[in-house]
Amino acid sequence: MTTPKKTAKTSGNEARELADLSEDIGIRFKYPNSERVYLQGSRDDIRVPLREIRQDDTYTAQGAEANPPIPVYDTSGVYGDPAAHIDLKQGLPHIRTAWLNERGDTEILPKLSSEYGIERAHDPKTAHLRFNQITRPRRAKSGGNVTQLHYARRGIITPEMEFVAIRERLKLDELSQKSEYAKLLKQHAGQSFGANIPTHPDQITPEFVRREIAAGRAIIPANINHPELEPMIIGRNFRVKINGNLGNSAVTSSLTEEVEKMVWSLRWGADTIMDLSTGAHIHETREWIIRNAPVPIGTVPIYQALEKTGGIAEDLTWDLFRDTLIEQAEQGVDYFTIHAGVLLRYVPMTADRLTGIVSRGGSIMAKWCLAHHRENFLYTHFDEICEIMKAYDVSFSLGDGLRPGCIADANDESQFAELHTLGELTSKAWKHDVQVMIEGPGHVPLQRVKENMTEELQHCFEAPFYTLGPLVTDIAPGYDHITSGIGAANIGWYGTAMLCYVTPKEHLGLPDKEDVRTGIITYKLAAHAADLAKGWPGAQLRDNALSKARFEFRWRDQFRLSLDPERAESFHDETLPAEGAKIAHFCSMCGPKFCSMKITQEVRDYADKQKAQRQGMEEKAVEFVKKGAKIYS
């Protein structure tokens, strides 16, 4: 292995910050009028979290009418459970350990397998930054395969599969039997573009999950060294998921900031997190994040490998990269972005592009290929990479290193040449029973977005598609969460399984916490719009509940049911801050005399009154006839 040429500098300030990591950083979330609920599986240790939003009663002339609680998908882990004990220095509970032990196909290693991992574990300069509750890593027994795809193809339903089936179902099968949800569960028919979307919640079974994984249409990213994970699924025939990025850089951000940013991302609804750190203490930062993450963690291993060479792409070697893969797999990374489709012969195709190669990983591998005039070592060593992946159940996120960086370059020869190669690599990974998803663009004008989905389905055999947006225009720096959210909603509808968020700082700088919040909310919105459009069962429940609350002027319920309750309430209170305004039958937009919903209610009340009068007159007429129709008795 190549000896690393660069040793990260330590920071006394960062050590002091780590010493202060506690609930004081605001990691326990308090969602308004919400309750954490656990759905019980077939065994005691399958407890699936969801959040129920309680609603106020509706008051009519006939009295109070109860509004039922609304269940919502919850990614917040222990941070959203008021009863949970939280200690970032101890990490999260190991909910999967018993499942892993019972399968009997893994072994606890006596020590780390990665040379760099061993070096970091014994480096006194980083002792003050290390997570101290590290356990020995787990690996498949010799010659074994421990992937969820391997089990699914053998007809085995794992606890992870049952967990995600319950999680996707969100107890809507139970609610569909209750009369109080009858109107709320009505929704428009979706257009699924050939996807096999369940038509009723009771079809979302562990067996359905197993079949989707076995077919390669879905993955459960779940490294055996991430026992803290609450399993989730990424696939075309499930809810659209979103990924949030974080990571330090050589310019800014600290280890503590990244841990806080990870927890903050969960608060707003990130389904997975990618740690894209390129600055100091990459190894230690990742350990802290994984040990405290209830969601899958992804990385781009070539970033850390490059850091080990001092930033010199030409000095990258297969041995160095292999050791980095093992280092990260033994920490518990759930999926790797691997840019194995950037082939030497594709690089010249990008010469006429307006913005060339914009992927960091893609540009690193392109530079290596040109410097050595050899084929991409990630491609030539792909089978060996698969051997590592299946020993830890790390999923592939096959990187789009030649994705377009502007709409002018969208859907060009180099982009689709790489995509077709990713399809070839998908087939190769599947021969090893390694789980795969495919990364997609990028920057694509709206009229050409669907073509990307069609190409991916055809050439990558329905492996889950994972896209960065796409951005549908290039004229809005500072607003690229919106330009990309438009493309994301569309491509999610067409079949993309996971959307990688974009923040307002895209192309401008490293995002801070508020940028992360804005990016995640934007992408939760895009994913939800896609779920509505493709007809996911129960997707419209929350919309209907919020619409009913809006019509009935239940302001607090409107805030509670929204994706960002705090912001919704703060916008309302900017003009009507008084508590009485929370029950007023108008807002500051129209005022009390011009509110369309208030007028509609008055029209309905008037119509009801007229109807009552007509009924009264009709009843009197019938009574008059029954009494002989005499005017005077």
From Swiss-Prot:
TM region(s), chain numbering: none
Any single biological process term in GO: thiamine diphosphate biosynthetic process
Enzyme Commission number: 4.1.99.17
Cofactor-binding details, from the entry: Binds 1 [4Fe-4S] cluster per subunit. The cluster is coordinated with 3 cysteines and an exchangeable S-adenosyl-L-methionine.
InterPro entries documented for this protein: ThiC, ThiC-associated_dom, ThiC/Bza_core_dom, ThiC/BzaA/B
Pathway participation: Cofactor biosynthesis; thiamine diphosphate biosynthesis
Gene Ontology annotations for the cellular component aspect, listed alphabetically: cytosol
Domain of life: Bacteria
Protein family according to the UniProt entry: Belongs to the ThiC family.
Entry protein name: Phosphomethylpyrimidine synthase
Biological classification of the source: Bacteria, Pseudomonadati, Pseudomonadota, Betaproteobacteria, Neisseriales
